[in-house]
Each structure stands twice: as C-alpha cells, then as structure tokens.
C-alpha cells in the first residue's frame, strides 16, 4: 500500500484490492483555508467514526456513496472515484460567508435549500462559481450539474431527518462527489462537524468547527458530544 494523496485532514492510500482505497483521518484541524491550524489528538478518530456512521445512514437511505466500511478507529475503506473539483454547499439557514456576500441576516431561514458550487482550487481560494463556469471549466455538463444539485438536496433531506432526531438543526454543509470508472457519480470525502454547521435547536449552540474558528469552546469535547448523540440513536 502506498500513499496516494495527503490533504489537510486525511491521507489516502492504495490497497491490494483494485478500485478500493484506505482513508486515514488525521489529528489536524484547520480554518480559513489553512490560515489557522493545530494538531488535536483524537480529532481524526472522532471524524472517522462520525463519517462512518453518517455514510452508513445515508446508504440505508438510498444515497449512493463511496463508503464501504470502517477499518479501525482512524481508517475506513472506500470505493475509488475520480473527485469532481467542486465543493457543493447546501444552505438551509444563513450564516458565515453568505451573510457577508449577500447581506442575509444570520439565522435567516431560506424558503428552499440553496445549493452553491465552489471551484476546488487552492491557489484561487476556492471561488464561488456559476453553472456556466462549471461547464466552461469542463467540470460537468448540464445533466451532471442537475444530478449534483439533486443529490445534494437529497442528502440534505436525509441529514435534516438525522439531525432532528438529535434535537439539532442542520444549518449548512459542504460535500464532494466523484465518478467511478463507469461514470457513476457518488458522494465522496466526508460528512462531519468539519464539513457541516450544526446548531442545537433550543440554544443555537454550535456542534461544529465554528467552535474552533471562533474560539468559543473545545473542538474535541464538541465533536465527542456530537458522536455520543449519534451513537445514542443506534
């Protein structure tokens, strides 16, 4: 097995099975496109366990994804895909960048989920792009754009259902997709408090990486509490 890719939060390794990869979650935490970063022991374990539970839940709710199984506390086995260079963001409630970009008041609830595309390009700081940009860049065609948006909305509905069971609100989240050798689009990467904004329904307390971004609490304790809530649903 050899290292195929290393990002801010994960390492990806080849395996001895064609078409399958081993993903290892790291104890690194970053914010602001890496401007702020720290090592937090146990963070990788938490995100791996959370993502494994959520992807298994999505599988049972008919969302096609790359997850095969959890291998260890920090590792999982996934189907190999070619990652589409888009961060697909779904917003249910206004907060973060959209309040600065478009003037929405924090906490404003959108009548319908808003889906946005961000071009995965570190040197460009992952800019917001339109459907036409996606086509001009050769990232996806009209049919694929339609499919990505629908899959994102379907994921949103399933995650809202899951969060409701934990008395939490899904504010927004970002996901990534990839294509199999046969061209099928699958949900990939991770879904965790690193990639979602999650608020307590009663207190609006954050259960996500904003506690690190804004220095409002312990990231490890927050993620552990979220994992405990997930495990209590089993």
UniProtKB/Swiss-Prot annotation:
Its EC number is 6.3.2.6. It comes from Staphylococcus epidermidis (strain ATCC 35984 / DSM 28319 / BCRC 17069 / CCUG 31568 / BM 3577 / RP62A). It catalyses: 5-amino-1-(5-phospho-D-ribosyl)imidazole-4-carboxylate + L-aspartate + ATP = (2S)-2-[5-amino-1-(5-phospho-beta-D-ribosyl)imidazole-4-carboxamido]succinate + ADP + phosphate + 2 H(+). It is an enzyme of class 6 (ligase). Keywords: ATP-binding, Ligase, Nucleotide-binding, Purine biosynthesis. One of its GO terms (molecular function) is ATP binding. Pathway: Purine metabolism; IMP biosynthesis via de novo pathway; 5-amino-1-(5-phospho-D-ribosyl)imidazole-4-carboxamide from 5-amino-1-(5-phospho-D-ribosyl)imidazole-4-carboxylate: step 1/2. This is Phosphoribosylaminoimidazole-succinocarboxamide synthase. PROSITE patterns: SAICAR_SYNTHETASE_1. GO terms for biological process: 'de novo' IMP biosynthetic process; cobalamin biosynthetic process.
């Amino acid at each position: 097995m050899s290292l195929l890719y290393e990002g801010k939060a994960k390492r990806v390794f080849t395996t001895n099975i064609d078409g399958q990869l081993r993903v290892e979650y790291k104890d690194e935490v970053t914010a602001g496109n890496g401007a702020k970063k720290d090592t937090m022991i146990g963070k990788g374990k938490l995100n791996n366990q959370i993502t494994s539970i959520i992807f298994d839940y999505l599988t049972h709710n008919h969302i096609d994804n790359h997850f095969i199984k959890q291998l260890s506390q920090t590792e999982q086995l996934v189907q190999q895909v070619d990652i589409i260079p888009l961060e697909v963001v779904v917003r249910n409630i206004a907060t973060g960048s959209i309040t600065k970009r478009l003037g929405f008041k924090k906490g404003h609830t959108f009548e319908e989920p808003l889906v946005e595309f961000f071009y995965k390009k570190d040197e460009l700081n992952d800019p917001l792009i339109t459907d036409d940009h996606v086509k001009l860049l050769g990232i996806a065609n009209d049919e694929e754009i339609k499919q990505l948006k629908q899959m994102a909305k379907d994921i949103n509905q399933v995650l809202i259902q899951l969060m409701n069971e934990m008395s939490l609100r899904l504010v927004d989240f970002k996901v990534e997709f990839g294509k199999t050798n046969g061209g099928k689009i699958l949900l990939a990467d991770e879904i965790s408090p690193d990639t979602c904004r999650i608020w307590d329904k009663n207190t609006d307390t954050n259960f996500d990486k904003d506690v690190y971004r804004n220095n409002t609490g312990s990231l490890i304790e927050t993620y552990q509490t979220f994992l405990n809530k997930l495990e209590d649903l089993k």
